[in-house]
């Protein structure tokens, strides 16, 4: 392993360690836009928006993880992500996500909805999960063709 071409990535949620390995690059949605983190990246501290975390590990295998939000800290040889919630693409259930999305859409259309912004935020998270499921599915299809 050439240390100039990889760095250590730690992804943890409040419940458990999701990922801890050497990687070549990651891509995640930061508070100010998309972040592509490569070896030797400048130090950085940023909020993370809900969406996919794309990882290319040191064996050229791609991982897709849903992040509901959190913080990323970039150091010269280590990147740490503390996620509010983190779920591997493999563990997301399409039917559960679609069902929750439909319920939230119906709730938004209800004019009596008390906290519309909260429902919109929840819907945004479900849409991000759907993007992760789609990315995982596409990655699986490419790998098996």
Curated annotation (Swiss-Prot):
Q: Which Gene3D superfamilies match?
A: F0F1 ATP synthase delta/epsilon subunit, N-terminal (2.60.15.10)
GO annotations of cellular component type: plasma membrane; proton-transporting ATP synthase complex
Q: Which UniProt keywords are present, listed alphabetically?
A: ATP synthesis, Cell membrane, CF(1), Hydrogen ion transport, Ion transport, Membrane, Transport
Judging by the UniProt lineage, the source's domain of life is Bacteria
The way this protein sits in the membrane is described as: Peripheral membrane protein
Q: Which parts of the chain are coiled coil?
A: none
Which compartment or compartments is the protein found in? Answer: Cell membrane
For this UniProt entry, the molecular function terms from Gene Ontology, in alphabetical order, are: ATP binding; proton-transporting ATP synthase activity, rotational mechanism
One Pfam family this sequence matches = ATP-synt_DE_N
Tell me where it mainly resides. membrane
Q: What does this protein do?
A: Produces ATP from ADP in the presence of a proton gradient across the membrane.
Report the family membership. Belongs to the ATPase epsilon chain family.
Annotated NCBIfam families: ATP_synt_epsi (TIGR01216)
Its assembly, as annotated, is: F-type ATPases have 2 components, CF(1) - the catalytic core - and CF(0) - the membrane proton channel. CF(1) has five subunits: alpha(3), beta(3), gamma(1), delta(1), epsilon(1). CF(0) has three main subunits: a, b and c.
Name of the protein described by the UniProt record: ATP synthase epsilon chain
* Biological source species: Buchnera aphidicola subsp. Baizongia pistaciae (strain Bp)
């Amino acid at each position: 392993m050439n240390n100039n071409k990889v760095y250590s990535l730690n992804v943890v949620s409040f419940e458990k360690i999701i990922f801890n390995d050497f990687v070549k690059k990651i891509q995640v949605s930061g508070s100010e836009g998309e972040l592509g983190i490569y070896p030797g990246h400048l130090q950085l501290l940023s909020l993370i928006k809900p969406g996919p975390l794309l990882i290319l590990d040191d064996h050229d295998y791609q991982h897709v993880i849903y992040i509901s939000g959190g913080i990323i800290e970039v150091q010269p040889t280590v990147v740490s992500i503390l996620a509010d919630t983190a779920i591997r693409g493999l563990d997301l259930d399409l039917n559960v996500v679609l069902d929750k999305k439909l319920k939230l859409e119906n709730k938004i259309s209800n004019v009596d909805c008390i906290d519309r912004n909260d429902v919109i935020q929840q819907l945004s998270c479900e849409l991000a999960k759907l993007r992760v499921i789609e990315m995982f599915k596409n990655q699986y299809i490419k790998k098996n063709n």
